Amino acid sequence: MSLPNPAALISQMAADLNAHLAQRAISEPRFIGIRTGGVWVAQALLEALGSDSPLGTLDVSFYRDDFSQNGLHPQVRPSELPFEIEGQHLVLIDDVLMSGRTIRAALNELFDYGRPASVTLVCLLDLNAAELPIRPNVVGATLSLAAHERVKLSGPAPLQLELQDLAL
């Protein structure tokens, strides 16, 4: 399987996000990337949008519902939100949407900071494997992988996608 070029996806995502925000009459969204890949995608997306908006970062490690199964990630860092959440229009950005559990955890954490006016979900890739009813408003590409395959994003510059075979 050939993976898409992240730079080309980011360019199209910027156009799609602008259209989505315009349709909803959102003029000053607040951007938040989910560590680590989502932050890289958010930085590239802000650059493609020509935006100098501050970027918030979320580390959802403590909010995941599989925390007791997987344990604590060795590099947990605090979330950094340089703006209010209450009443704001948020653009939540992640690299890969698989089960939906990371996004659920991110939403739980965000609501601990306040009640946003809206949340627009942006993902570089949707792996079409959702376990929860979560879908991105803007997506770079949708892929279907075999059960033994995963996609890994490396970055921050350049962003590159790698297909990993867990069966090997």
UniProtKB/Swiss-Prot annotation:
Catalytic reaction annotation: UMP + diphosphate = 5-phospho-alpha-D-ribose 1-diphosphate + uracil
Keywords: Glycosyltransferase, Transcription, Transcription regulation, Transferase
Motif segment (PRPP-binding): 90-102
GO terms for biological process, alphabetical: regulation of DNA-templated transcription
InterPro entries: PRibTrfase_dom (IPR000836), PRTase-like (IPR029057), PyrR (IPR023050), PyrR_bifunctional (IPR050137)
EC number in record: 2.4.2.9
Domain of life: Bacteria
HAMAP family attached to this UniProt entry: PyrR
Family: Belongs to the purine/pyrimidine phosphoribosyltransferase family. PyrR subfamily.
Protein name in UniProt: Bifunctional protein PyrR
